[in-house]
């Protein structure tokens, strides 16, 4: 069995730069409570604060779903690590269903 394909460090930095780091929860333009590098969900509450390390852990956890989804969509098609990272970044931004 092949190991799960993961985003490379350049892709991680790309997502972090696009999302920006917010250590205090805020409402995004869509009205959703958000923290860290674009993390949303029932675990984000008004006034919540996190550390940079916690923000990175949340992002890595969030990316699991997108890495798996992109890997499934790509299948055996040859892609470079940077191409895969770009697709994960896009999926993180617009959602897997929009790919």
Task: Please tell me what each predicted stretch does.
Residues 1-99:
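Cell-wall polysaccharide-cleaving catalytic domain and substrate-binding groove, primarily
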